[in-house]
Amino acid sequence: MYFTFTTIGIFDSMGAEAVDFITKQTELACIFTEQAYIEKIIAMKKDKLATTVKNLVSYDPVKPADVEACQAVGITLVEYSYVIEQGTNDTTPFRKCKQDDYPIFSYTSGTTGDSKGVKLTHTNLLSSA
């Protein structure tokens, strides 16, 4: 186990307010997404929602107009292939993760109020395997 980042699932069924709540609570700075959601994220930023988001990584080819629109709201937009290329060329050693690091925050739908987040550690995940 050598990755020390945390993943947080954001589902298309979540409304803008739920996404705003999750991004602020977790201080989420980067979202990996599909082309179809880029405009929605830009609109959220224009509405002063998801203010912690600074980077978008698109699994799909990026349109120049989307890059400009993202820049206008303070987001850097790149393609997933660019991230892979940068990682391939980076020789910085990984920081080995610890058993109590959190690889996943899992959020509920929040049927009563805001979404509830569950922090899962590496130990939690391995005990379920």
Name each model-derived stretch.
Residues 1-2, 20, 87-88, 111:
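Generic signal for short, ordered secondary-structure residues
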Residues 12, 92, 116-118:
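Flexible, active-site-adjacent loop/turn segments at secondary-structure boundaries
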Residues 18-21, 124, 128:
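Well-ordered alpha-helical segments embedded in enzymatic catalytic cores
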